[in-house]
UniProtKB/Swiss-Prot annotation:
Residues binding S-adenosyl-L-methionine, per UniProt: Q190, Y218, N223, E239, D299
Name of the protein: tRNA/tmRNA (uracil-C(5))-methyltransferase
GO cellular component: cytosol
Keywords: Methyltransferase, S-adenosyl-L-methionine, Transferase, tRNA processing
Length: 366
């Protein structure tokens, strides 16, 4: 695979290999055949980051080869959304002959939605001033004249200039209901929107008929919490990053959801609060003991769950675990399988043509 060519004819073969690999990894814990969710074969990534290479009068996007570290020129990127591809050529055309926008530009980040909105961040090794803002506004207006719904941001050391806003609003059809998700520049969002829809619908399916409340750790912008709210009496969710918490609060209001409570704290702190080890000022007004959480949802970072959180989640009758790293999932399952068994297993092809796998398991108490 090269950045400008996807081996789409090999899509089914690479997916089949992942299914075999996941089944093999899960064999000590389950003999289930994974439910498999396919990605679009191209234009599936909603965000992308490129370094910018200056070559005489020319400049262009590059990425670095992971093995050789050599730079690769990228003029089109079929893994990314069609809007990102349109913007890549439009941004280079708009910056190439503009000394103010071009000077010391070293990276461009793109974030897009299925609803055809974009935030583009230009990163610089220089101070940004009013002249930069004026030139950036002219570029933004020229892009919008081409029917590109785009917001521009300038970044430099300790500097961030938003011309309008630093977010876009995604609209996803999830099990017959449109969900609105605010996505903030430089915060985590699901990279493959089509796959995100399938993940949300799978999570809804496996929690159908749930009793009681849901607890979610690492909720981000509320991606799963808000979609799953319809299956539970109440949802209590934790998140540590301030921009994600703010986006989650916006999303609760935008989706007219009244049974989700977001609290800003780390999973480790929440474990201490639940166990009565510590009291936290930011939990004032929230009666943790009033929640009857029968299900816990975790979507941890690549490192998986730490040992304290492992112990904590074992206290819940049902554990819904979305993993971006099956190796750490299996490590966690060595502990979790002592008290719980795997009821459902899914493979989500979030990153086609790569080694990476995303998967989901539903565990129920033995």
């Amino acid at each position: 695979m090269t950045p400008e060519h996807l081996p789409t004819e090999q899509y089914e073969a690479q997916l089949a290999e992942k299914v075999v690999r996941l089944q093999s990894m899960m064999a000590p814990f389950s003999n289930l055949v994974p439910e498999v969710f396919r990605s679009p074969v191209s234009h599936y990534r909603m965000r992308a980051e490129f370094r910018i290479w200056h070559d005489g009068d020319d400049l262009y996007h590059i990425i670095f080869d992971q093995q050789t570290k050599s730079r690769i020129r990228v003029d089109s990127f079929p893994a990314a959304s069609e809007l990102i591809n349109q913007l890549m050529s439009a941004m280079i055309a708009g910056v190439r002959n503009n000394p103010v926008l071009r000077h010391k530009l070293f990276q461009i980040d793109y974030l897009t939605t299925l609803s055809n909105q974009a935030v583009v961040s230009l990163l610089y090794h220089k101070k940004l001033n009013d002249e930069w803002r004026q030139q950036a506004e002219a570029l933004r207006d020229a892009l919008r004249a081409q029917n590109l719904n785009v917001h521009l941001i300038g970044r430099a050391t300790k500097t961030k200039i938003e011309l309008d806003q630093d977010y876009i609003d995604e609209r996803l059809p999830v099990a017959g209901k449109e969900m609105i998700y605010r996505q903030v520049e430089n915060s985590f969002t699901q990279p493959n929107a089509a796959m995100n829809i399938q993940m949300l619908e799978w999570a809804l399916d496996v929690t159908k008929g749930s009793k009681g409340d849901l607890l979610e750790l690492y909720c981000g912008n509320g991606n799963f919490s808000l979609a799953l709210a319809r299956n539970f009496d109440r949802v209590l969710a934790t998140e540590i990053a301030k921009p994600s918490v703010a986006a989650a609060q916006y999303n609760i209001a935008a989706n007219h959801i009244d049974n989700v409570q977001i609290i800003r704290m780390a999973a480790e702190e929440f474990t201490q609060a639940m166990n009565g080890v510590r009291e936290f000022h930011r939990l004032q007004g929230i009666d943790l003991k009033s929640y009857q959480c029968e299900t816990i949802f975790v979507d941890p970072p690549r490192s998986g769950l730490d040992s304290e959180t492992e112990k904590m989640v074992q206290a819940y009758p049902r554990i819904l675990y979305i993993s971006c790293n099956p190796e750490t999932l299996c490590k966690n399952l060595e502990t979790l399988s002592q008290t719980h068994k795997v009821e459902r297993l899914a493979l989500f092809d979030q990153f086609p043509y790569t080694h990476h796998m995303e998967c989901g398991v539903l565990l129920t108490a033995k």
